Amino acid sequence: AKKEAEKAEKLRAAGVQPQKKKAVGSKFFNDLAGLMGDEFMKRGATLHGCDVRTRDAFANMDIAGYNYGIYRYKHDLKKYPNRLILGSETFCNDAYRFREQAKKNPRLVGDFVWAGMDYLGEVGVGSWEYKAYATQFSGLGWTTAGSGRIDLNGRPLGEALYTRVALEQEIGPYIAVRPVMFSGEKHSPSAWKMTDAMPSWSWAGCEGKKAHIEVYARAAKVALLLNGKKVAEKQLKNDCLAKFTIPYQSGTLEAVSYDAIDRVLGRCKLQTAGADTVLRAVPEEKKTKPGRLCYIRIRYTDRAGELKPMERGMVNITVSGGKLLAAGSACPFHPGSYLTPETDTYYGEALAVVEAGES
């Protein structure tokens, strides 16, 4: 692998584009799903051959694991009355549907959304990336899948909030906003990405642009307020997600969720960051011991600590009293190294991993 990487780097330095290999096996189907959408995978799982190939094996298993089998659950639970089913790999946008089915049938024992956290490999399969962060939508430079509900640096995204509400760990509401500065721009295709929304209302310079807002709530309806004024309201049916599009205006964005008789169930607010910008180093733990790993978030914020996702810059990291082991952003397109002290930021943030020293 090292020799292949060195060869590819030499070709790139010489301006030679490597030959694109034909996708086969899992990569072929992943690429096809990226182009055709998640229905391709879910409809494929309902083909008769899938049942024929698995029924004998499942008859000898304690639990049958289904990949993208949301459309098979109801049928198979009836056809195989002794079968326990686990969603071993599923799409994020099916989490609500799974939960509603599982409440009606306890033989649906669990669901694993792919993927909980981003990871190295299967590069770009779950990424919605824009040209500002990815100079090309395929080829060299991609390092992670981009399909995590939690990004590579450990930051929960809008999809993580949606999943928590869908699986009834919380009732919400939560607000997440798609990057307003990229509104209307094309992004890399993926079936494994439900949304690129994040919990932020800090989009400086985007006044008047379309803001695509998502509210996640277990409720009968949700209302959206901007700077104290109600600007939209939606009923929630067959999902815990309401989508709104309004012109961006800085200030306070609030979501209020209601039950069927208009009682308030919850509130959530996002506040625009102030005009001042500060680069902060924020350790996850205030105290540590020699030899322990310290994860330090490097963030562009205002003076109150509110993240500013539109701020971007190259950061050079120096460490005293410890050893820098790695540094990088969560961007799936990362043509550089995680082993150097210099890193770009991604939506206002990067991460440094430091081994604590004796002092």
Regions flagged by a language model, labelled:
Residues 2-291, 303-307:
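Substrate-binding clefts and catalytic carboxylate motifs of secreted carbohydrate-active enzymes
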Residues 216, 353-355:
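Short hydrophobic/aromatic beta-strand micro-patches
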Residues 221-229, 312-325:
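Extended low-complexity, serine/threonine- and proline-enriched intrinsically disordered segments
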Residues 276-280, 317-333:
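Short aromatic-acidic-glycine turn motif
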